[in-house]
Amino acid sequence: MNQIEKTGELSASRFTVRDFTELVKIGIVNSNTITAFTGMWLAFQLNGISFIQNVDVIFFTIVGSALIVAASGAFNNVIDRDIDGIMERTKNRPTMTGKISGKRALMVALVLGVVGTIMLFMTTWQAGVLGVIGVFLYVVVYSLYAKRKLVSNTVIGSFSGAVPPLIGWFAVEPSFSMVPIMLFLVMFCWQPPHFYAIAIKRKDEYAAAGIPMLPVVKGIERTKKSMFFWVILLTILPFFMFDLGIVYVILATLLNIGWLALSVYGFKMADSIKWAKWMFIYSLNYMTILFVAMVVISIFL
């Protein structure tokens, strides 16, 4: 048993709410819950299904989605203990400081995952299966393998990050249509430029940890080209979402043009780290505005 584990065994019983939120990566939980809610809300609105008469579905979908995302974050913290201490942004995670032992973190992850999955299956079996697939993709395919072995790790990890809006939709309306497909693609295409911005800022840390992020393996200029490519793909998607009305299409297009302009500016800007910070901030605002707009605009359809 290493020193972290020894310390963890002594202090695990005293971990705080803040330690718990850091263990489950509460920021990621919140953002994924928003996208799951959006998928669910649009399924209600666009299919003429009563929101008020399905309070149980709403509860199980939102809480279940939050729990499986939280479980995935906790699993990831357990898996990454060997590299988290090397990186500045992760060295103070509770699994590194000893506030939560590896065994305790694993137990928390298992409980959250099982309870969350059961709740999703209480909506529709399709939502439950999607939840299981999402956790498997993130924990096994991404965290255990792709993150450490493949330069395409970010793209592979984007599959799991695009699952929550599908869960929300299929919990209400378990059939495919253009809207849930586009929600998946929006989230899938949004993640590479978002996480590549982080990778550029933390390039040296990822290199020290031996993580083959795109900026580490191919360089920053190559990463900028990839980010530009993914933003271009995003600019196409609104034109397949006229079910949400012309106002949404215009708003999404304007947001995409802004992000595209910022992406192009990156090829001329000498300070790549500063530019990456701008890209990161824009990506967060982009997702928030876009998904809130989907909810609000759909009310008036």
Swiss-Prot record:
One of the protein's GO biological processes: heme O biosynthetic process
Catalytic activities: heme b + (2E,6E)-farnesyl diphosphate + H2O = Fe(II)-heme o + diphosphate
Any one GO cellular component localisation term in the record: plasma membrane
One Gene Ontology MF term: protoheme IX farnesyltransferase activity
One Pfam family recorded for the sequence: UbiA
Keywords associated with the record: Cell membrane, Heme biosynthesis, Membrane, Transferase, Transmembrane, Transmembrane helix
Enzyme kind, highest EC tier: transferase
CDD domains linked to this entry: PT_UbiA_Cox10
InterPro entries hit by this protein: Protohaem_IX_farnesylTrfase, UbiA_prenyltransferase, UbiA_prenylTrfase_CS, UbiA_sf
Other facts noted in the record for this chain: Carbon 2 of the heme B porphyrin ring is defined according to the Fischer nomenclature.
NCBIfam families tied to this protein: cyoE_ctaB
Subunit organization: Interacts with CtaA.
Name listed for the protein in its UniProt record: Protoheme IX farnesyltransferase
Organism whose genome encodes this protein: Listeria welshimeri serovar 6b (strain ATCC 35897 / DSM 20650 / CCUG 15529 / CIP 8149 / NCTC 11857 / SLCC 5334 / V8)
